[in-house]
């Protein structure tokens, strides 16, 4: 199983466009419903910082087959002031965070 957090900061004029691209990823995920995969995206209160939390039981991750994710990734560097940084994590404890 792999788990990671990806964090980046968009340019202020690109934050809403980024959020729309993220919503398109979730729309496709809700249609295709890949198993063994959990994903959430957070927009922080500064409105330009985004955090993605990914947990996948499969390798490669099913997110790589999502067309909307490819479209999201295609222009990510151009939308960002701070590029995405991915960090692998190990869960210490959780209350219903990855279930349900």
Language-model segments: what does each one mean?
Residues 14-16, 60-62, 94:
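Residue-level signal for secondary-structure boundary sites
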Residues 23-25, 44, 98:
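Residue-level signature of transmembrane alpha-helix interfaces in integral membrane proteins
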Residues 43-45, 88-92:
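A general secondary-structure junction signal
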Residues 92-100:
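Short, low-order "capping/linker" segments at domain edges
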């Amino acid at each position: 199983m792999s788990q990671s957090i990806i964090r980046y900061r968009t340019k202020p004029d690109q934050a809403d466009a980024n959020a729309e691209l993220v919503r398109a990823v979730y729309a496709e995920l809700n249609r295709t419903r890949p198993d063994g995969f959990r994903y959430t995206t957070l927009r922080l209160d500064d409105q330009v910082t985004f955090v993605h939390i990914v947990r996948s039981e499969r390798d490669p991750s099913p997110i790589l087959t999502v067309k909307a994710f490819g479209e999201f990734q295609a222009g990510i560097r151009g939308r960002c002031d701070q590029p995405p940084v991915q960090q692998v994590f190990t869960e210490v404890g959780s209350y219903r965070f990855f279930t349900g």
